[in-house]
Amino acid sequence: MAEQRIGRVNSGDVSLFYRAFGAPGGKTPILILHGSNYYDSYDWIGVASALAIDREVVTPDRRGWGESTWSPSKDYSRDALLDDILAVTAGVRWDKFILMGHSGAGPVIISFAVNFPDRLEKLVIVDSQMNRDENAGAGQKIGNPPQIWPTVEAAMAPFAKLNNPPRFGLDRERALQALIKTEQGYMLKRDPDNANTNAIGEGAALPARRLVREMWMELGMVKTPAILVRGLQSDRFPPETVERFTKEYPHIPQFPVNSQHDVPRMAPDALIGHTKKFIGSV
């Protein structure tokens, strides 16, 4: 396993934290984007280090998540997320790279492949549900109170009961990494306004620079070679979604693995194996 390094890079009004593995200058590097909800780069340490034997692998915390800072302008737009990819890869001095994204990162990596096809060698989609945007939360977009629980166990409890629980709900050590101890209790390291896609303040009047398209349509525009790794027990891929994906994208190989939605936790070896075979000697 490759040793971990940590770094930061500025992007717009945030400071992005990232974990890096492997030596620069090897084969085509890989950027891994974690999902939304209760994931961050911590969940990808094992997979990233295993993939970094012959190349550099970087996995950042999304803006507003984990050790990355919250956006003062509450800008969690698609433009901002694509700019963050550009900022991280510029910071580590990459030209072309392989892009992998899990869960709510799926729409972002697909959009990046459409908008910046010359930057990518290959695309790895990991259990990203196709018929919803996991970042599109309902309700108030800004001014939401932070999530605070009296104990670590209280924070874990509701997520442990989910049909497809994240590691946060099952692993106390992992949960601690995602929480900050405050006078009121344990606060989640995530901006409660992370679903806001319209910046406030000076950036509010700026037009979007890139279209946000329906996900099925946008994936059909991708020219970069791609694969889908999905969990056989994942609630993101019911039979009707698998059927539609197979029909509409016969050119994108699917690799089902014995896992629920949290593929990097439940099927890391299978994910690593399929990824290595797909990227080959690139």
Language model features with spans:
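Conserved alpha/beta-hydrolase catalytic His-Asp/Glu region
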Residues: 150-203, 209
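Alpha/beta-hydrolase fold catalytic core
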Residues: 1-32, 53-55, 94-95, 250-253, ...
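Catalytic histidine-centered segment of alpha/beta-hydrolase-like enzymes
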Residues: 259-272
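Conserved HGGG/HGGXW glycine-rich cap/lid loop of the alpha/beta-hydrolase fold
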Residues: 14-70
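Flexible "cap/lid" loop of the alpha/beta hydrolase fold
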Residues: 110-114, 121-154
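Active-site loop/oxyanion-hole signature of alpha/beta-hydrolase fold enzymes
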Residues: 45, 49, 53, 58-100, ...
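Conserved serine/cysteine hydrolase catalytic core
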Residues: 182-248, 258
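Conserved catalytic-core motifs of eukaryotic protein kinase domains, centered on the activation segment
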Residues: 42-44, 68-74, 134-137, 239-240
